[in-house]
């Protein structure tokens, strides 16, 4: 074989040998070293073909082209007469990718990053890319304070030019901050400034979730916090001169030093607005008014810019530019703010689209819109639509996107992107207490029936003391104006004695129809009619019950074996709702007030009225709404009319998961006082405490709850992030610590007549409990767990510390 002349060596190991500019004609091309790559594929990637006249430049381009395919580690081009001999060394193919030692970074995240860099099973191994990944991962660990971390790629050769790739992590420990120093501060102490930082060099003993770990991102955020702190207090010349982060020799400790120049405090001398104000100069001037002598405040300046943008956004100017330039006068320590406004083009809405509503029909979402197609874009109207969709409770998230129409200078599409949640639930409840044992309830509720927005519910309870069934249907848009129509049918067979209440049996059934009228965005009124039939029997001689019967013209006897009574009542039902919550379930901001009431109308056997007021206020204490304070109240009052009393079976009760947790359901408040004569269902000497007068039994006190015609319940709740729950499920799980209190009383109780018994007309007998609750929006419906310990209770109260419900939230 003739001596082969070296034309080009590998770009990694040698440089090209230059031949004459005239070159030579290639009559054949041969490859050596190809395994996985086909000859045809290699030839297609080369700029040289058989019959071409090639020179040094052509050979260099050939090598570059072959390297550019990413298939080769080494390329050599040799000449053997008129034949080009291409010697290659293929990059090995990745057969598998594994990880070891990674605790802070999950495997899935690592795989995603590797694939984004082109490193995946079946692809060629690029050692340069692997080295870059090693360095990038180590830089990540350094940014979170793990300076002793290392990442090494271990490549294990396999047959057929394949390799196993294993990334071995040694994460080490997080460096802890030993000290944070601020140099140059005179107006504020270092402790005061550091108290606003996320990073800490000291953690109080009571802060069980705090730590002193260093993170580069947190330091950057703390520096911005420091800058804002000074700018918000008039220090317009404030500057962070430098920041030093020093590492101890063992890489376990960090010292942070921030050098600052405070400067002097400056006052605002005025605000000058210029530019294209789109005819809204008067409104913009109102937003830029300042108080005389007011200190310069960076946050207020930013808010002013945002307010101007929002104002213009309401009039269709979707992309305004607002820029504030402080003009500092060092002589008199004042700042004049020059605000330049460019409203830009006015935009109109071409279409409103919805994405993600696989179940809910478009019409259900579209009827909540306040922004109209064909009208100019109003940012406030778009936001109202988002709020209304959130309040429906059909969606986990609602996001908006304003998209410019290609080719149109003044049109946009508004896109609402929703993520639907399971609006149907199978409701199942269970509770256990030292007094009550186990109780159950069940039902089915669908708040978005077949995507129409109709609410349909079938609920029932079956236990030792109650058989209850209810069918309800509500059309929230009975008319196009948003008037709702709801109806309900129910049946209830209630055995009060088995529920530890005063003994009676009530079999009732009825129906009601309600119309709802929207007043504005946040207020609505309700009005309707109802009918209920009550069949009472087995009524034991109890003071409050007998008092009601006497008011109805009945004269029951304590010796009667079966006191029974029937009523038919027609009621006018009314209500008012104010709802400004930010979402329909698991709210984090806003308030809700709900007033409901009913009064009997002519034709009824009873004459009474009853009113209930529920309030809930959510106050977020951080920008992300992860920490929220919730205050709830429930007030109730009812009484008779025309000399009659409100029926005892309409009484208010408290205790249980929806009122005062830690107490058995419905057991807070007045207890039954019985007439003991010839009572047949209890033994006064054993079950009850009976008073005597002149050797004869008088009245018997019991622990049977009877409720009252007045109720007050309040709760203070602190909602916190749920530990060990990822952000993906944060909107589905809620943890809270609570303090509940409440009382029920009977305003018609005559304490002077029953001086030897508790004063059940006293509203100050307040019960209290505290505990923890967990709520989860599961596929079955909302699950609620609570554990509460009563710490203020009275004789006869029944505790139920642990309570668990499926399908019930508050």
Curated annotation (Swiss-Prot):
Disulfide bonds: none
HAMAP family (alphabetical): OM_assembly_BamA
NCBIfam families: OM_YaeT, PRK11067.1
Subunit relationships: Part of the Bam complex, which is composed of the outer membrane protein BamA, and four lipoproteins BamB, BamC, BamD and BamE.
Gene Ontology biological process terms, A to Z: Gram-negative-bacterium-type cell outer membrane assembly; protein insertion into membrane
Name used for this protein in its record: Outer membrane protein assembly factor BamA
Similarity annotation: Belongs to the BamA family.
Source species: Escherichia coli O1:K1 / APEC
Main location: membrane
Functional summary from the UniProt entry: Part of the outer membrane protein assembly complex, which is involved in assembly and insertion of beta-barrel proteins into the outer membrane. Constitutes, with BamD, the core component of the assembly machinery.
Gene: bamA
């Amino acid at each position: 074989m003739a001596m082969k002349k070296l034309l080009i060596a590998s770009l990694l190991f040698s440089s090209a040998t230059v031949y004459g500019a005239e070159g030579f004609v290639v009559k054949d091309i041969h490859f050596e070293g190809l395994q996985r790559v086909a000859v045809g594929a290699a030839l297609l990637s080369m700029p040289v073909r058989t019959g071409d006249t090639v020179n040094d430049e052509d050979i260099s381009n050939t090598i570059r082209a072959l390297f550019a395919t990413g298939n080769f580690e080494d390329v050599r081009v040799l000449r053997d007469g008129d034949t080009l001999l291409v010697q290659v060394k293929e990059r090995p193919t990745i057969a598998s990718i594994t990880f070891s030692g990674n605790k802070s970074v999950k495997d899935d995240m690592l795989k995603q990053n590797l694939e984004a860099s082109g490193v995946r099973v079946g692809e060629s191994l690029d050692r340069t890319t692997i080295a870059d990944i090693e360095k990038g991962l180590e830089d990540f660990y350094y940014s979170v304070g793990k300076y002793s971390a290392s990442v090494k790629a271990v490549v294990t050769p396999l047959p057929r030019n394949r390799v196993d790739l294993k990334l071995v992590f040694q994460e080490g420990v997080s460096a802890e901050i030993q000290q944070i120093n601020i140099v140059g501060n005179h107006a504020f102490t270092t402790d005061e400034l550091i108290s606003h930082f996320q990073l800490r060099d000291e953690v109080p003993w009571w802060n069980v979730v705090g730590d002193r770990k260093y993170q580069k991102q947190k330091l950057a955020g703390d520096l911005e916090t420091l800058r804002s702190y000074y700018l918000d207090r008039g220090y317009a010349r404030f500057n962070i001169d430098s920041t030093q982060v020093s590492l101890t020799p063992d890489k376990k400790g960090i010292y942070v030093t921030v050098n600052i120049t405070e400067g002097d405090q400056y006052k605002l001398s005025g605000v000058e607005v210029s530019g294209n104000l789109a005819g809204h100069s008067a409104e913009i001037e109102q937003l830029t008014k300042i108080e005389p002598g007011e200190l310069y405040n960076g946050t207020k300046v930013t808010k002013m810019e945002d307010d101007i943008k929002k104002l213009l956004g309401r009039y269709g100017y979707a992309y305004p530019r607002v820029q504030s330039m402080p003009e500092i006068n060092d002589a008199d320590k004042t700042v004049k703010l020059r605000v330049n406004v460019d409203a830009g083009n006015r935009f109109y809405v071409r279409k409103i689209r919805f994405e993600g509503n696989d179940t809910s029909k478009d019409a259900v979402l579209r009827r909540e819109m306040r922004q109209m197609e064909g009208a100019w874009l109003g940012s406030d109207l778009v936001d109202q639509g988002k709020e209304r969709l959130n309040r429906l409770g059909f969606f986990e998230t609602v996001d908006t996107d304003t998209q410019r129409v290609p080719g149109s200078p003044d049109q946009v599409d508004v896109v609402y992107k929703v993520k639907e949640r399971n609006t149907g639930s199978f409701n199942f409840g269970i509770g256990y207490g030292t007094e009550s044992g186990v109780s159950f309830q069940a039902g089915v509720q669908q708040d978005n029936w077949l995507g129409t927005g109709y609410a349909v519910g079938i609920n029932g309870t079956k236990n030792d003391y109650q058989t209850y069934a209810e069918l309800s249907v509500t059309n929230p848009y009975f008319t196009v104006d948003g008037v709702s129509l709801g109806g309900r049918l129910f049946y209830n067979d209630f055995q009060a004695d088995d529920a530890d209440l005063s003994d009676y049996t009530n079999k009732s059934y009825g129906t009601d129809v309600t119309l709802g009228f929207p007043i504005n965005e946040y207020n609505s009124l309700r009005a309707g009619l109802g009918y209920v039939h009550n069949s009472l029997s087995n009524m034991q001689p109890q003071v409050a019950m007998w008092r009601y019967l006497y008011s109805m013209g009945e004269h029951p006897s304590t010796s009667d074996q079966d006191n029974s009574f029937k009523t038919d009542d027609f009621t006018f039902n009314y209500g008012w709702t104010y709802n400004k919550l930010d979402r329909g379930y698991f709210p984090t901001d806003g308030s809700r007030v709900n007033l409901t009431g009913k009064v009997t109308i002519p034709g009824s056997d009873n004459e009474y009225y009853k009113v209930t007021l529920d309030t809930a206020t959510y106050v977020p204490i951080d920008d992300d709404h992860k920490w929220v304070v919730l205050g709830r109240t429930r007030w109730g009052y009812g009484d008779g009319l025309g000399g009659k009393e409100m029926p005892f079976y309409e009484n208010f009760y408290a205790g249980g998961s929806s009122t005062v947790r830690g107490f058995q359901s419905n057991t807070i408040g007045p207890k039954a006082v019985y007439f003991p004569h010839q009572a047949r269902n209890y033994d006064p000497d054993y079950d009850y405490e009976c008073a005597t007068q002149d050797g004869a039994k008088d009245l018997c006190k019991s622990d049977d709850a009877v409720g009252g015609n007045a109720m007050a319940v309040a709760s203070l709740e602190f909602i916190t992030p749920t530990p060990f729950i990822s952000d993906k499920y944060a909107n589905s799980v809620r943890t809270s610590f609570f303090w509940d209190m409440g009382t029920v009383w009977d305003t018609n109780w005559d304490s002077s007549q029953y001086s030897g018994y508790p004063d059940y007309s006293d509203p100050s007998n307040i019960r209290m409990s505290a505990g923890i609750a967990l709520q989860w929006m599961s596929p079955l419906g909302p699950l609620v767990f609570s554990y509460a310990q009563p710490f203020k209770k009275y004789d006869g109260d029944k505790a139920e510390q642990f309570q668990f419900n499926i399908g019930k939230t508050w």
